[in-house]
């Protein structure tokens, strides 16, 4: 039996469910999720492998109109995948009408000269008639290879989408070992899990201004716990105060919630230490962006 493989980008506006879809396909969390826009900042690879195929998904930052150097990085990071993949999944939400952001993305996709599958997510939130209207509207704007309605949260139609991708893959090599599920090191995943808890627990002004740096991560020979030292970076003193909370209560809660997820991922007991530091306007400083891990990565 021949083996098939290929690279697939997941593109769309912020908060359409790209990371939820990837996590569902992989059967575990490799991309953090939040109801805050622009949660995903880096391209994240999810490697789906069976005995018949290997689909390398690339989850991308939500495409938006950037206002900072970080925003520029995120949008360019998303569009750069068009040079690297065999197929694009263009994801839109079933419960929102087509907007200017969708039109902007489609203009780029029309020039990409690679197959584009329209994935309409969140079908569990709409009536079938509304879904049909959405399909007709998008089809009137662009010639898609296929249109697949799904619910990434509930898993509806996700197997159908995987089968469709497999049918369209070329015969090829297995690029990664069958037990590898992502290209990112554990340090990156740990930092993202901490950032996810900050997004979940803090106010609206905080999310875009937060970065997490893992200062050290090593096993303690005495306790056999993985000892992690992490710094949460913000842009203003007021944000630092919010994250620390009254008598350190918010920072403690962030640490407790993050530690549980990190222990599940690593399969080890974890001792997590967190600090908060202010780095003014880091989102507009290229050196700071690079220091915090926001640099272009080609696949």
UniProtKB/Swiss-Prot annotation:
Location in the cell: Cytoplasm; Cell membrane
Chain residue ranges for the region called G2: 38-42
Residue ranges of the region described as G1: 12-19
GO BP: ribosomal small subunit assembly
Residue span, Era-type G domain: 4-171
Gene Ontology terms, MF aspect: GTP binding; GTPase activity; ribosomal small subunit binding; small ribosomal subunit rRNA binding
A single cellular component GO annotation: plasma membrane
Keyword Cytoplasm attached: yes
Chain spans, region G4: 121-124
Name assigned to this protein: GTPase Era
Organism: Streptococcus uberis (strain ATCC BAA-854 / 0140J)
């Amino acid at each position: 039996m021949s083996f098939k493989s290929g690279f697939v980008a997941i593109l769309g506006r912020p908060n359409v469910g790209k990371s939820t879809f990837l996590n569902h396909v992989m059967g575990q969390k490799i991309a953090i999720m939040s109801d805050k826009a622009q949660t995903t900042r880096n391209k994240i690879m999810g490697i789906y492998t069976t005995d018949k195929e290997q689909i390398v998904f690339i989850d991308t930052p939500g495409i938006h109109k950037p206002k900072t150097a970080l925003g520029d990085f995120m949008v360019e990071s998303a569009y750069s995948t068009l040079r690297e993949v065999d197929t694009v999944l263009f994801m839109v939400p079933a419960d929102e009408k087509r907007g200017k952001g969708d039109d902007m993305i489609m203009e780029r996709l029309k020039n990409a000269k690679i197959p584009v599958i329209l994935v309409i997510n969140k079908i569990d939130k709409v009536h079938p008639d509304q879904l049909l209207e959405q399909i007709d509207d998008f089809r009137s704007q662009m010639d898609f290879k296929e249109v697949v309605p799904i619910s990434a949260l509930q898993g509806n139609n996700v197997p159908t989408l995987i089968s469709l991708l497999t049918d369209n893959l070329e015969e090829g090599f297995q690029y990664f070992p069958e037990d590898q599920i992502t290209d990112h090191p554990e340090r990156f995943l740990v930092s993202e899990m901490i950032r996810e808890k900050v997004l979940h627990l803090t106010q609206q002004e905080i999310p875009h201004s937060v970065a997490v740096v893992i200062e050290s991560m090593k096993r303690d020979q005495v306790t056999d716990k993985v000892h992690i030292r992490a710094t949460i970076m913000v842009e203003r003193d007021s944000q630092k105060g919010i994250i620390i909370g009254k008598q350190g209560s918010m920072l403690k809660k962030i640490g407790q919630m993050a530690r549980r997820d990190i222990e599940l991922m690593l399969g080890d007991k974890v001792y997590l230490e967190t600090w908060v530091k202010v780095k003014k306007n880091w989102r507009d400083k290229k050196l700071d962006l690079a220091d915090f891990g926001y640099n272009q990565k080609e696949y």
